[in-house]
C-alpha cells in the first residue's frame, strides 16, 4: 500500500500502486455504510457484469480506458476496488487477488478520535 486513510469515520481506503497502470484504491466499510465517490456513482458504464470469484459474487463496472470499479460483499463488509483510466483490463487482472486475499473486521473497544 502507498497510502491509507479513513473517510467519514466509516470507510477505510487503501491506495495501491499497480505497475504499470498506476494506482488502484480499495474501500471497505461495514455493509450499508460504504462511501462511493460521486464520480463513480454518476458514471454510465458500458460494461457491467457479475462474476463468481471463490464463491463471492463480484460486480464489475467498466468503461474502456476510463473509470472502472469492482464491488462485492462478504462477512458483513462491503468492498469496492476503484481504478481511474485502467490500462489493458487492469481490473480483470487484479480483481481475483483482491477478492480472495482481502478481509476486514471490526475492532472492539477502540474509539476513533479526530485531531
Region locations from a protein language model:
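Short, solvent-exposed recognition patches
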Residues: 1-78
Amino acid at each position: 500500500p502507498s497510502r491509507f486513510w479513513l473517510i467519514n469515520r466509516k470507510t477505510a481506503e487503501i491506495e495501491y500502486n499497480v505497475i504499470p497502470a498506476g494506482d488502484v484504491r480499495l474501500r471497505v466499510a461495514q455493509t450499508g455504510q460504504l462511501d462511493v465517490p460521486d464520480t463513480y456513482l454518476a458514471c454510465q458504464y458500458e460494461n457491467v457484469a457479475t462474476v463468481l470469484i471463490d464463491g463471492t459474487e463480484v460486480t464489475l463496472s467498466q468503461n474502456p480506458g476510463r473509470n472502472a470499479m469492482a464491488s462485492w460483499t462478504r462477512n458483513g463488509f462491503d468492498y469496492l476496488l476503484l481504478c481511474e483510466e485502467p490500462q489493458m483490463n487492469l481490473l480483470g487482472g487484479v480483481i481475483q487477488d483482491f477478492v480472495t486475499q482481502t478481509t476486514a473486521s471490526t475492532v472492539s473497544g477502540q474509539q476513533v478520535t479526530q485531531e
